[in-house]
């Protein structure tokens, strides 16, 4: 079941939110009574169920556990049923509360009578995480329930996404179900936007590849509708959910001014979101508290605003506002299960609003009339909020139209802030103050005081100033200025500013009414006029920084370059350069500066630069951008790679190429990304600081530059492609090829493309333009009238000795020309084998004779390297040649001299490669390549597999490739039906028709059990292997020891091989294995497969001779099922042969492990003498053996478990650290609970008491010392909340708690023994072993029971009141009163009671506990007839 919480040092599971601590403790105590103990999964399911149950109306105080049990769904995971059943047994039944009386006011409509709920209901419980999902279509009630849950949330909000994600997890919907759900939940506009985003995400996912997706079976949406395609359906569901987060408006978080408190959001959570948003949104140095206090009231919901208004705390400190609103929680507004109200007849009286009969006034649709005339215009027909005089005059509001979008992205990294209740801020147009990037933010305003005309002045806008600042020249002469201290950027100032406590009127250009301030600061030096945040907030204005993009080139700047997440700019130092390189670099930088490719720059970031000399003697500028590339995100390229030029139809004979000059330098770079492309030009000999520059255009060396340029060039050429549909424009990077059917159309196309490129600022290079007639060199290939060849072919020297670098370089050149080289994969495979095991470039490789022959074959094939251009009217055919070394495929067309392409595919790196799977993969690869490059699929496939082998594979195989082969079976032809063509002789090569041995099945697999054959069971591990041969009885069994370097997989193979060797006399055999790997391996071998590389190649090759010609039945057996059928029992017997028997602990081993007492050893099989001898022989017990013990004394013991506890804190030194052990012991049973802490505080004491309660139960009384932690207010409040009575020991005597002190000694002794046995034992483990020994192993000699058995026993019987206490002889003591400095002894007096640490002495008419250190034994005072006192009874001191 998992890890249980029986260990006392494990933390208590945290209570669900909204559940009282005493209720949670009841559930914990019930859970700990389960047998076996509860697991983490049980607590997880209990918390999950309680979170949902809290939201239902049956959650009352006290809880009705019987009703709560009815809410648990059938087959609910975990053991929640058992926990609630225990609580039902322990809790007495309660009477139902009386119903509420009806309303007596005749003016009010009667309330809705509550209908009795027939059956308990609860909110729907979805599948837990990890439960298997079962698909079922939506029902109307399901859609209604989902819509009700998301009715108060916006699409894309966290609440909306959480509900939708759980619904998808529960129902496992198909693509059609998700479409229906979207149409039901969202508006048509949101559904349209979601559809666009979903199509974009699906296109990106299809290009990246999806597991199980077949491009030929239709779009992903069609394939996801199949309920059996669970993997594709899961991919579609994730894309469908991701489309919500990409909706416009959901990608940007709300600013701090737009964060609203949700209708069900706690006020504290709302204030926390505001605080985070202000930390991210306010400029540095801006005071946050005034804005936070203002928004905490203005953006709160109606309930919290009413509370603050009623208490007059709308502008109070934030702490008072939090305390005022802490009584309002969303529990008051939780959703409940609605009961259908009883229909009441409509009233006979007319409605006082509309005057009509038939409805109550509360249901009237007529708007409520105003209570009186409008206080503004005295019009009785409208409310004040609708008064026309309060409408904003828009005649002079040109600035309201300046809300233009900024093209530059925001620099600040935003954090995801939760929207309160899924609400969005209202769309209100605030006054905008346009600012400039080059100048300070200023505004022309007019300032006036009482009875003074307004004065025009230019003010500086400062959102960091709490209060407005005005110069002293504007202040009236008779103003009453007061001294004040101002805290600014330069520190506190006391003599520069005065405060004016009178109203100030500020007239703003975009506001008709002036802004009135109650006070402002006066600058006595007449230097500053600052419009502070008090004025800006009152006028509800918004500062707007207009973006002024610099126009560098006609080409638009890219929107995304991969650095939008704004990582820290790289700082790579510039390395030194010699004078020649430095001079060349200076010239190159000067040219780039003149061309306006770079500009001077002062800012962070640096990447090194250096020049490289070309073969013609010129220098090339290189910027090392590897550091920037490492933090740049890859962009999805619009093209999958270079095009296959054989797709250029022969019907387009007229060609022309266009070359672009410095193409990358034509795309402007946004200024926000300049730190990532900055560099430093050093001074000679470091005579001064270097000159800083940064790129203005897209530089070469940036990894996303090719992709960005392709996007820009494709945007320019798209309109031209639509204008000339009969022509082709092939674009790859900065290379462009034009193809047209006629010369006139080619000329027109060339002019159109040239004009479009020149208009966008992309310069052309006319001297590099090529045109037909004649060959065209493009992308390293030569385009002729009917064929495609490569410009250069590798020259191969047939020799036997190669260096690693030479062989790698030659194979790389062969890889480039392999699409046109007529050679099989086997020749290339031999050369790839020669590279294995070599890593040093200086290694010398000696080729074998077979590899040298492969070189000759490739050298001859290179002379025939040529490919045909596509003929649109002819179909495309494919040839597949499967070989043990790899697959060779050819695409060709009939009646053509050369094929279209040669494709070589290596086999996967697995131990067995089924040829059926390889054939299916080749079909998919060829169809995909043909569809991608030629726009059509292959008409037929010619392969080297016989029809007999293919038919047998389709009938007997259970591989997934069978469905693919059956789907394309109508296009299969073996090599007997050869296509026509001049290169037909190639198909008749002997090596193609060579028989493949692995295609012939070496043995036969029977679909059913063979009755007359014996059964073989085998298994293996890393150290042993075993097998059993059974035929009505065990015929043979054997265990094999394996080498130390053997793996578990090899051990299983060893066991099977040994069993097959013993089974040679039988022609048929039943094989039962618990290894899925071996079962699949045998089935693949029976169908035919190519062997692959494996660490157990030798073992795999031994299987074929042992199985040759046999008929076998293979069956997979699940291990460790404990079933009683013969197959499971024989498999368990095979496993048992490799395992040693599990023996119980003997008394000696038990004592070595736990150091328990002799009585515990006697309970585990040892005699009294043996137990005594074991303890005496233990070395650890001899070294650590406590001498002496404290006297028993008298303590207050409980008469039942959990009646009275004693608690104490003892200290333990462990590895240079001092730990506190918080010990709780039950005075009745002696059961102990311990918590290990680093501190001794009130919180630690509360936590330790919670741990003890969860294990031992809740006590009625606890007794501790008078330490500060136990007397803290937090601990006292916790005890009072659980109704636990707390008392302390005797004052001034910390040793008076005898039981817990003795327990401390026993605990420390055991821990010391465990640490002596193992110095590296963790302290938590030592504490757990000690508790196990004390509570469950050690036997108390007085009752012959363990402490835990005594803790579970019945309470002691009550003592009759007439029972007299035993008579004891009186004892007399001299004493000193604790706390007094008097050194004289008082007494003697007679003690009333004695305990382990003190005695109860009558002092001055009362009784005090006096510790032993302040007591001295005395004798009875001499009576009047005194006799000689016995000298033996003289005073003496006794220490307890």
From Swiss-Prot:
Domain RNase H type-1: 1010-1143
One CC-aspect GO term: viral nucleocapsid
Classification via SUPFAM superfamilies: Acid proteases, DNA/RNA polymerases, Retroviral matrix proteins, Retrovirus capsid dimerization domain-like, Retrovirus capsid protein, N-terminal core domain, Retrovirus zinc finger-like domains, Ribonuclease H-like
Cofactor remark: Binds 2 magnesium ions for reverse transcriptase polymerase activity. Binds 2 magnesium ions for ribonuclease H (RNase H) activity.
Binding annotation for Mg(2+) 3: 1208, 1265
Swiss-Prot/TrEMBL cofactor(s): Mg(2+)
EC number(s) from the headed UniProt entry: 3.4.23.-, 2.7.7.49, 2.7.7.7, 3.1.26.4
Pfam families linked: Gag_p19 (PF02228), Gag_p24 (PF00607), Gag_p24_C (PF19317), IN_DBD_C (PF00552), Integrase_Zn (PF02022), RNase_H (PF00075), rve (PF00665), RVP (PF00077)
Residue numbers covered by motif PTAP/PSAP motif: 98-101
Further comment found in the protein's record: The reverse transcriptase is an error-prone enzyme that lacks a proof-reading function. High mutations rate is a direct consequence of this characteristic. RT also displays frequent template switching leading to high recombination rate. Recombination mostly occurs between homologous regions of the two copackaged RNA genomes. If these two RNA molecules derive from different viral strains, reverse transcription will give rise to highly recombinated proviral DNAs.
Protein task: Matrix protein p19 targets Gag, Gag-Pro and Gag-Pro-Pol polyproteins to the plasma membrane via a multipartite membrane binding signal, that includes its myristoylated N-terminus. Also mediates nuclear localization of the preintegration complex. Capsid protein p24 forms the conical core of the virus that encapsulates the genomic RNA-nucleocapsid complex.
Record protein name field: Gag-Pro-Pol polyprotein
Taxonomic lineage: Viruses, Riboviria, Pararnavirae, Artverviricota, Revtraviricetes
Gene this chain is encoded by: gag-pro-pol
